[in-house]
Amino acid sequence: MTRCFLKFIFILILTNLSFKSVANDKILLIGDSLSAGYGLEQAQAWVHLLQNKYSDDNKAITIINTAISGQTTDNALLKIDAWLKAHQPSHVLIELGGNDGIRGFPVKLLQKHLTQLVTKSQQHGAKVALMEIHIPPNLGPRYRQMFTDSYSKVTKQTGAYLMPYFMSDIAVDSSLMLNDNLHPNVKAQPIIRDFMSIEIDKWLQD
């Protein structure tokens, strides 16, 4: 009886360990200055705050942040193969396009690059989320609309997950922005952390 009970406990432990191993989510974040913590100490940036939250909540989620200030979709395409090989992510979150838009890159080129980033990640076995980026109004209503629509088009074509933009409510509040009116300040970082915590949970459960 005792031997059977011990065997049962041992199987439960192995099952639990196996479940924990499967439940580990490794998210490769490919982004620009908005995720790189532009103008801030790294410990103040939303990605660092969110990773701390996952640790505090005992969530087996790791964020690998490859965000670089000024990064465009074509820059990321030059590096994504190496990132995927080095980090072997289960998930890839793409927060890119803002710099493409500010520089007036053609919308079709943006869509092509985003599609390539998504499909490369999917071919590597990762689940992909594409954040719907919005650009400043001074770039003109027609270009802005075509730009924003690119994200839903790419997700429909590729089956990627469309994630809402974390700057939508922040960009219109000057108290949450740096003096350049392009980047979120330190006060905005916990707000972005909480927003992304909710949105990433939705994505992982999708």
Please annotate each region the language model reported.
Residues 1-9:
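Bacterial N-terminal signal peptides that target proteins for export
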Residues 9, 24-27, 59, 68, ...:
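Catalytic-site microenvironment of enzymes
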